């Protein structure tokens, strides 16, 4: 194969009938057409539902390196659905993805996703199962006429960054050790239980000594 990018130039020692083992890519254009046709067929099949599939929750990326960014998660947690007033079984039938394994670790993420669900529910045009006998919660005939298939992602997630104005750095900020503070905070969180246990044992020993 041809050298790629700025890597080391190899000195390949070709043996074992190497010409039979050359990887080819002649089916790429046809595969591209096939994928496109499959997408179009799926869009026609699921119409008037959104092409991109069900709505996904807003989640933060894991690890310190990426947790400044938000992205789409797998599914909404059961707690989020409960606060939004949506049944978990009914949610799947109206284009809401559900992940019963997910746990909410912060109030901010919980509130953001509950608000997302409520907004989605208010915008949703719900077709009746039987057009002759619509049920409570189904959209009106006027709204059904307005319904169009959404081609992009449902309620796309955007990373919004606030720009801070330039200002003079204070002396306290200059002396602040960010890395050491983070390490200390992590250590305190990790050792919280052990320290509490030791403090409890020490207090019990003091009580015994006083006796």
From Swiss-Prot:
InterPro entries: Ribosomal_eL13 (IPR001380), Ribosomal_eL13_CS (IPR018256). PANTHER family: 60S RIBOSOMAL PROTEIN L13 (PTHR11722), LARGE RIBOSOMAL SUBUNIT PROTEIN EL13 (PTHR11722:SF0). It is found in: Cytoplasm. The lineage of its organism: Eukaryota, Metazoa, Chordata, Craniata, Vertebrata. This is Large ribosomal subunit protein eL13. Transmembrane segments: none annotated. Belongs to the eukaryotic ribosomal protein eL13 family. It comes from the Eukaryota. Its main location: cytoplasm. It comes from Gallus gallus (Chicken). GO terms for molecular function: RNA binding; structural constituent of ribosome. One of its GO terms (cellular component) is synapse. The keyword Ribonucleoprotein applies. GO terms for biological process: bone development; translation.
């Amino acid at each position: 194969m041809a050298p790629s990018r700025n890597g080391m130039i190899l000195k390949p020692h070709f043996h074992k009938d190497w010409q039979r083992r050359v990887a080819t890519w002649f089916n790429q254009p046809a595969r591209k057409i096939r994928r496109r046709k499959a997408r179009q067929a799926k869009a026609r099949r699921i119409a008037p539902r959104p092409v991109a599939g069900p709505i996904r929750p807003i989640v933060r990326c894991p690890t310190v390196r990426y947790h400044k960014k938000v992205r789409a998660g797998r599914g909404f947690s059961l707690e989020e659905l409960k606060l939004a007033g949506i049944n978990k079984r009914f949610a799947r039938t109206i284009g809401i993805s559900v992940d019963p394994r997910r746990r909410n670790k912060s109030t901010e993420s919980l509130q953001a996703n509950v608000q997302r669900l409520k907004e989605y529910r208010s915008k949703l045009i719900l077709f009746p199962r039987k057009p002759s006998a619509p049920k409570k919660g189904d959209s009106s005939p006027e709204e059904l006429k307005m319904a169009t298939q959404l081609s992009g992602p449902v309620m796309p997630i955007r990373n919004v960054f606030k720009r801070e104005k330039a200002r003079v750095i204070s002396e306290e900020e200059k002396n602040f050790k960010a890395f050491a503070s983070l390490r200390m905070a992590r250590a305190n969180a990790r050792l919280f239980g052990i320290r509490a246990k030791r403090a409890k044992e020490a207090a019990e020993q003091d009580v015994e000594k006083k006796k």
